[in-house]
């Protein structure tokens, strides 16, 4: 069954995740395919992006699609006063799929409700970033061969980081042993996210209390751009630094992930450890997004 919109991690079933992982395996080493020849992908990035935009662009090209779009709101008619709905309607005329990033929570869902073509959410405010969760889980699957039964530690800004929301929701499709949520009290996971989870969650402020139990340490930067109060940001901006002292307390086969960009939350000395998998994680973005494009736009014998 072809996917329609991918606005939230919850739009994917467990079977969807594994089917995308299988496709990503097949796409990992290909140079160019023509599966999406004749298709046009719009990259509608109303908010700045480097890795996400470029990896989506590369994924579309490697499948044979043409790519149009923009990299900032200032380069669109929105700067002249056009509303989001009209922009989405116009992009419907030019393309077969819209990959969208926006600063407002819920923007991708809004777009999906008026769009006749698939919307893929590339990040909307502090809400979700479902394709990053796909990459995160695929990395874990590649390293361990499974996702079920693992203990996770999510560390840093758990209030404003949309990658955290998507990962927590995606994990409801699996069977994690437990999740440690490690953050300052000001940056705890929001209640509406916690209420939808179906696995054990333990909140703490001290990573040293739980690091020895963790298989996957998922680190996020403090999201300065999401803070309304500059003083609040200053209080928490360097709450945690993952350094060699912390890493040396991890399980030998434990891994460290980060959606990037990194600022100061992971000491660069950690990069050379066997636990550091965040650059490997980033390298999987293109095959995962190729797999997603294929699921959304590829021809099906049963269509």
UniProtKB/Swiss-Prot annotation:
L-aspartate binds at residues 80, 162, 221. Pfam families: OTCace, OTCace_N. This is Aspartate carbamoyltransferase catalytic subunit. Heterooligomer of catalytic and regulatory chains. Carbamoyl phosphate binds at residues 51-52, 101, 129, 132, 260-261. Pathway: Pyrimidine metabolism; UMP biosynthesis via de novo pathway; (S)-dihydroorotate from bicarbonate: step 2/3. One of its GO terms (molecular function) is aspartate carbamoyltransferase activity. Its EC number is 2.1.3.2.
